[in-house]
Amino acid sequence: MKNRIMVIGAHPDDIEFGCGGTIVKHKTNGDFVVYVCMTNTESVDGITGNVLRTKDQNKSEVESAVNKLGCDQLEFLPFKDLHVPFNFESVSKLEKYIKKYNINTIYTHWAGDANQDHISTFKTTMAAARYVPNVYC
């Protein structure tokens, strides 16, 4: 049976840096992979607030990465860069995709990360994935 994998990152490029090689390994094994990005906005500098990449640039870069990595599905959650929440809304939105794709393995951020969006993504993932048998951080 193919594994049903979900990779969850707070921002565009987090997933590629964090587990791009793991995605390729799963795709080589014939697994189904869903890429989930918690943010769907421009990327901004956390100190100055200056826009680093527009929403369209981010979307285009993620779509290119998803195609190159061979992911089967791409999903964006509606949260803003620097404002990824850990609350009922974020958990329920992520849980909807976990159920939709019948996911049995998840990869996400490490709990000890210093980035606040990464921490919120970790917490949201752990709550939404409480019934998923394999969660790796």
Q: What is each PLM-predicted segment?
A:
Residues 94-137:
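Active-site adenylate/phosphate-handling loop in enzymes that bind or generate adenylated species
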Residues 1-101:
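Active-site rim/loop-helix segments in enzyme catalytic domains that contact anionic ligands
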